[in-house]
Amino acid sequence: MKDKFSQQAATYAQFRPDYPSELYDFILQNTDNQGVAWDCATGNGQAAKVLARHFEKVYATDISQKQIDNAVQVDNICYSVQSAEQTNFEHNTFDLITVAQAIHWFEWDKFYAEVQRVAKPNATLAVWGYSMPQVQDDKINQELQDFYKNETGPYWDFERRHIDAHYATIPFPFEEIKTPQYQIKVEWDLAMLEGYLNSWSATQNFIKMNGYNPVDGFIVKMKTLWKEKEIKTTIFPVFLKLSKFLKIN
């Protein structure tokens, strides 16, 4: 499992969008018991804080201490620094295991073996992510896609391709439940977009190699198209893989 977000942990916590309530509703409808959940690669606890409203106990793990330090604190969430592939949890512990926007960084065979070990019989595994945002303005969206594909494109890690493929390229050796299509819809000003772009691992890779931030020049260009404090509807496509019985095919 790779740690790609320690350096920008505070930015990640502030500017990453929340997942839609309908996604959680569907996951809960397909979970037999709401006792104990594991949110793996929790980041800043975005998913864990929602699960905590429904489960007696949520264990939230991440490989990054800085991410854990920036995580939201809730009484029934227990945070710890652990990898996805090897944990200290007991066998048959969890009713639900979730991974949000992170499984593309995992060693899949080892993670799935760990899932098999720590999941209760008939537990649910839910894995989801979101891809590039679409700003509801054709000119701005064209510039944003160009920034993603061309300016920062060479600086994305190889694993990013799994996001672009909506996880179709990631093995999922369990019986899948057909899932609806979801989206994250936000109303953003330009400052929010700037913060989100600065949370990208590709942005940090670019800075390390070139000594300057590519987002700065992009935002200067955007200011000719996007007025200060002007609100734009922005949509992130969300994709979900879900299994209820965790039987290896």
Regions found by a protein language model. Name each.
Residues 4-17:
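Class I SAM-dependent methyltransferase Rossmann-like catalytic core
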Residues 17-35:
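Conserved alpha-helix/loop element of class I SAM-dependent methyltransferases that forms part
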Residues 38, 44-86:
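Class I SAM-dependent methyltransferase SAM/SAH-binding core
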Residues 85-96:
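A short acidic, Gly/Pro-enriched loop at the edge of an enzyme's catalytic core
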Residues 95-109:
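A short SAM/SAH-binding and catalytic strip from SAM-dependent methyltransferases
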Residues 110-122:
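A short glycine-rich, Lys/Arg-flanked "PGG" loop and its adjoining helix->strand segment in the class I
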Residues 121-186:
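Conserved catalytic/acceptor-binding region of the Class I
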Residues 165-249:
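Conserved Class I S-adenosyl-L-methionine
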